[in-house]
Amino acid sequence: MTTATDGFADGRLRVLVLGSTGSIGTQALEVIAANPDRFEVVGLAAGGSNLDTLRRQRAETGVTEIAIADERAAQLAGDIAYQEPDAVTRLVEETEADVVLNALVGALGLRPTLAALASGARLALANKESLVAGGPLVLQAAQPGQIVPVDSEHSALAQCLRAGTPDEVAKLVLTASGGPFRGWSAADLQEVTPEQAGAHPTWSMGPMNTLNSASLVNKGLELIETHLLFGISYERIEVVVHPQSIVHSMVTFVDGSTIAQASPPDMKLPISLALGWPRRVPGAARYCDFSQAQTWEFEPLDDEVFPAVELARHAGETGGCMTAVYNAANEEAAAAFLAGRISFPAIVGTIADVLHAADQWAVSPANVDDVLDAQRWARQRAQRAIAKASPAGACEKVSGLA
């Protein structure tokens, strides 16, 4: 395998796209197609839920190295090179790439993340769950600078941190739009439907990310990811609400300076930067327009109504496999909400219940199996909590969000 460390000096970068049919994956392929002098697709991987899109991508890119995680979907797709249970991981291990973009959804991305790091390729990481769940294992496997974040907030922090040295950093500030329920009361949230939770005010994302943003669980995952990526203690990471989603994050330095990264909400900017890091791709996104009056608002997060971020902070500070427990409990609870089995507030309530009983997992994992065991336990515990939850406030499943 080849590690890409010198930008574009040696020719086009070979990119392996995992999660190619999702929101991040499709936008990444658009970035690559718009910059054929910089990037070349060498492989695609998908879960298997959108075979028509994958077929179109195969035709457009001419790629033959393709993996589908779901065996049944792989059989329906026909001539697919990798379709075993470990298809995506094998694709990463056997395909020469300079950059592996991991945009898979959920904990499915952990083994491919570790395989990408072992290959020496740069890992453009959009699958935050693999870092949150794998934590110490992922950090141990990574070379310095090998992981480049795709999330807009972490991309912003990486850019802002260029303005100073590590010992000059006072704190990191993550921004959150506040989601579609910003300003709502806890009582109001009892009546939220999956359709309402699937409408983000500023970003266009996949269904699970959109729901996680509505519950603020996504910001909790990003808090954990921030600590792991940049090595900053949790007490030096703040979360503020910024409904316009123009300032994507900020870094405050010891002299009182605060450096912010601002751009209109468009994931193609952090995607392009992660693919070409540390060089920028011209024309990746629109500029901010300062020719007209506008207001950028910042306000504190209401932790009482939206406790997901503080639960994530607790899980991260406790350490061990607790962040994996947080993530797995959320995945179960989110699925239950979309199926109409629990109310919207019960998503975070389920996470809290599982974390409260998870003291046994406050031990660092020795291997991937330890992480998977913690997640399996968390899912089972979450399922029990969901079964006990009151159906009051639960709503019908909305097609297209589950």
Swiss-Prot record:
The keyword Kinase does not apply. Pathway: Isoprenoid biosynthesis; isopentenyl diphosphate biosynthesis via DXP pathway; isopentenyl diphosphate from 1-deoxy-D-xylulose 5-phosphate: step 1/6. Pfam families: DXP_redisom_C, DXP_reductoisom, DXPR_C. Belongs to the DXR family. It comes from Mycobacterium ulcerans (strain Agy99). It catalyses: 2-C-methyl-D-erythritol 4-phosphate + NADP(+) = 1-deoxy-D-xylulose 5-phosphate + NADPH + H(+). The keyword Zinc does not apply. Its EC number is 1.1.1.267. This is 1-deoxy-D-xylulose 5-phosphate reductoisomerase. Transmembrane segments: none annotated. GO terms for molecular function: 1-deoxy-D-xylulose-5-phosphate reductoisomerase activity; manganese ion binding; NADPH binding. One of its GO terms (biological process) is isopentenyl diphosphate biosynthetic process, methylerythritol 4-phosphate pathway involved in terpenoid biosynthetic process. Signal peptide: none annotated. It comes from the Bacteria. NADPH binds at T21, G22, S23, I24, G47, N50, N127, E129, G206. Its cofactor is Mg(2+); Mn(2+). 1-deoxy-D-xylulose 5-phosphate binds at K128, S152, E153, S177, H200, S213, N218, K219, E222. Keywords: Isoprene biosynthesis, Manganese, Metal-binding, NADP, Oxidoreductase. Mn(2+) binds at D151, E153, E222. Catalyzes the NADPH-dependent rearrangement and reduction of 1-deoxy-D-xylulose-5-phosphate (DXP) to 2-C-methyl-D-erythritol 4-phosphate (MEP).
